[in-house]
């Protein structure tokens, strides 16, 4: 089990670098934390980006690695939006949320060519 966690950590690090390049990020967030599923029960979300602290929190518990990475991509898009001076607006259907959703999906489609084995894992 520890080996799989280590592999997933390596993939997450690789993915952050991939997304940073694709989005042409000026910097990385101050921290990216992976937490258990209790966070999603408490906050009703699988990920957050705090624009004040520049921190990302991603729920990893009981989720496929590709789903975790898609959430990470979504939050990294919010980081990019902050770099561009776009207003934070977490409302469902807002322009920045729709952009983050669409771009995260696009990034996952591109990353499948880098790590196709992600889609054969359980």
Language-model segment annotations:
Residues 8, 12, 69, 96:
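Hydrophobic (often cysteine-bearing) scaffold residues that line and stabilize catalytic clefts
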Residues 90-122:
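Post-HExxH zinc-binding segment in Zn-dependent metallohydrolases
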Residues 1-7, 80:
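N-terminal low-structure segments adjacent to metalloprotease catalytic domains
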Residues 55-72, 90-92:
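Short pre-active-site segment immediately N-terminal to the catalytic Zn-binding motif
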Residues 70-83:
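Active-site recognition of the HExxH zinc-binding catalytic motif
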Residues 82-91:
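Substrate-binding clefts and substrate-entry loops adjacent to catalytic sites
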């Amino acid at each position: 089990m520890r080996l799989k966690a280590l592999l997933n950590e390596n993939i997450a690090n690789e993915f952050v670098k991939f997304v940073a390049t694709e989005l042409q990020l000026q910097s990385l967030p101050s921290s990216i934390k992976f937490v258990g599923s209790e966070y999603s029960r408490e906050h009703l979300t699988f990920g957050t980006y705090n624009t004040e602290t520049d921190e990302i929190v991603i729920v990893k518990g009981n989720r496929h690695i590709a789903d975790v990475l898609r959430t990470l991509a979504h939050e990294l898009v919010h980081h990019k939006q902050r770099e561009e001076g776009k207003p934070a607006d977490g409302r469902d259907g807002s322009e920045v949320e729709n952009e983050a959703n669409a771009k995260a999906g696009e990034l996952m489609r591109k990353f499948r060519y880098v790590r196709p084995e992600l889609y054969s894992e359980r």
